[in-house]
Amino acid sequence: MAEIKNYTLNFGPQHPAAHGVLRLVLELDGEVIQRADPHIGLLHRATEKLAESKTFIQSVPYMDRLDYVSMMVNEHGYVLAIERLLGIDVPERAQYIRVLFDEITRVLNHLMWIGAHALDVGAMAVFLYAFREREDLMDVYEAVSGARMHAAYYRPGGVYRDLPDAMPQYKASKIRNEKALARMNEARSGSVLDFIDDFFTRFPKCVDEYETLLTDNRIWKQRLVGIGVVSPERALQMGLTGPMLRGSGIAWDLRKKQPYEVYDRMDFDVPVGVNGDCYDRYLVRVEEMRQSIRIAKQCIEWLRKNPGPVMTDNHKVAPPSRVGMKTNMEDLIHHFKLFTEGFHVPEGEAYAAVEHPKGEFGIYLVSDGANKPYRLKIRAPGFAHLASLDEMARGHMIADAVTIIGTQDIVFGEIDR
């Protein structure tokens, strides 16, 4: 009898479950995966090289475009590295705002993940539910920075501006009657902080809805339990971080182990899995959303009681106030010089890592004393996770490869850079 050879199948880069431009070359024995070879580079934009020809502040918007689902956390890692080289202190209020927006971004990311992951596996409803909540958080992004996605809100030394006193409201239009308009603007009558508070008061019920649809769903469990199992030892060896590592039972979270900003003052728990499969990673991320609610509530409470500056008083780094620029020529010149020439960063190197929704996002920054980085190295969590795909998918069906890509929460902006 003739020997049957394995055959190869190209999965992506146009496949809707490939999460962007992933090309997987699968070696199959029937429908069982023998080898999965990810081909990357289709979204390579030379971010690290571009940063070498831009001033330190001009590279902040590039960070938003790495993992374009977790925008502000990318910025956070970058500005932390600059602040370490400059040796400047960030005002306490700015630190609380950063932590608040890190957690808003974590929820944004996990909502996108749960919607896309469920949709890939075949559950449509969760996707629509998740985007209902994402819309409110996108509005918060827009209220503080003017942009729904690429915010450029974190700056070396603090944040772009304090939280506004008014939340933008929906305007009357042909598709909305007055009753619908009043309902949509109900939570928008106060400040941005009031709106965020209202959102996180409502949000636990929304998470309960997602869990009602998925957690004990028989089909969901059949598709996730026992798929893509990673032992704690292998998770460490492969460099997995974030929910991928915690899903395997290792309680490693930079917010607890190497706290930055004001995370050491926050009261929250680190959810940890037991079996290291796709289902455990799902449970870890859902619980992370609940912990983000706790952290956000603590930040809101502190921010209400403690007004103050949100930018460092080091004028070599901080731009002048808008009011000053309108009345004072020196302030206008200062602003122009700062945003065209930038500021010089002392010679040295620094590594700053933040607990990104996907794992450890690190920025290694080398300065030669100029106004531009000498070298910028980005440590993207998704890169190590994608490298583990071959091992996780081996012995599973083609349909399970989709589940494994979903559980890794891959976004190609940060992998290809």
Curated annotation (Swiss-Prot):
Its membrane topology: Peripheral membrane protein
Keywords from the UniProt entry: Cell inner membrane, Cell membrane, Membrane, NAD, Quinone, Translocase, Transport, Ubiquinone
Matches recorded under Gene3D superfamilies: Cytochrome-c3 Hydrogenase, chain B
Catalytic reaction(s) noted: a quinone + NADH + 5 H(+)(in) = a quinol + NAD(+) + 4 H(+)(out)
Main location (coarse class): membrane
EC number(s) from the headed UniProt entry: 7.1.1.-
Location relative to the cell: Cell inner membrane
Gene Ontology MF, one: NAD binding
Source organism superkingdom: Bacteria
GO terms under cellular component: plasma membrane
PANTHER family membership: NADH DEHYDROGENASE [UBIQUINONE] IRON-SULFUR PROTEIN 2, MITOCHONDRIAL, NADH-UBIQUINONE OXIDOREDUCTASE 49 KDA SUBUNIT
Job description of the protein: NDH-1 shuttles electrons from NADH, via FMN and iron-sulfur (Fe-S) centers, to quinones in the respiratory chain. The immediate electron acceptor for the enzyme in this species is believed to be ubiquinone. Couples the redox reaction to proton translocation (for every two electrons transferred, four hydrogen ions are translocated across the cytoplasmic membrane), and thus conserves the redox energy in a proton gradient.
Assembly behavior: NDH-1 is composed of 14 different subunits. Subunits NuoB, C, D, E, F, and G constitute the peripheral sector of the complex.
Family: Belongs to the complex I 49 kDa subunit family.
NCBIfam families assigned to the protein according to its UniProt record, in alphabetical order: NuoD, PRK06075.1
Stated name of the protein: NADH-quinone oxidoreductase subunit D
Species of provenance: Burkholderia ambifaria (strain ATCC BAA-244 / DSM 16087 / CCUG 44356 / LMG 19182 / AMMD) (Burkholderia cepacia (strain AMMD))
Organism phylogeny: Bacteria, Pseudomonadati, Pseudomonadota, Betaproteobacteria, Burkholderiales
